[in-house]
Amino acid sequence: LGYSLHLQGIDLKNIAHLFDKEQFEFYHHDVTKFVHVPGDLDYILHFASPASPIDYLKIPIQTLKVGSLGTHNLLGLAKAKSARILIASTSEVYGDPLVHPQTEDYYGNVNTIGPRGVYDEAKRFQESLTMAYHNFHGLETRIVRIFNTYGPRMRLNDGRVIPAFMGQALRGEDLTIFGNGEQTRSFCYV
């Protein structure tokens, strides 16, 4: 298996346990550049994107480029290799939803020029481009909208609610609640 990763905000030690595995090949690559992987490919998993608000607010143009050029490059690679591709999207495509819970036919309420707009729009464009490749080229695609991931090796200063709460608890601080505290979230442990 080959993996093409751009390591913005990722620590290599988090995947060091995979390096000795015979079936694992690691490629360090910027997906916004042309992607070539030698040999046959069955699947491409496109998870490249900053997901932390701390990161995507620092690198807004790169975030948009990964969602557009990076996705285009990986869809092109999938087409060239006759590979299936899974695109990791996000609940952020819904923006600040007016409907709870959101169904897949809900289009969302996104502020395209707001602070989160770069991430939200990168993912919305990524989904549209993926569907265009599917409909126009017949590429076998899947899109998964992942909600609020959390798990081991997550940075406590990530900018998302679970690491923020964990960091505050570990420091013996009160947990910061925004608004009236009645917000709901769906979480995905990874």
Residue ranges of each PLM-predicted region?
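N-terminal Rossmann-like NAD(P)+-binding domain of SDR-like oxidoreductases, especially those catalyzing
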Residues: 1-149, 169, 179
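Glycine/proline-rich active-site loop of Rossmann-fold NAD(P)-dependent oxidoreductases
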Residues: 124, 139-140, 149-164, 171-173, ...
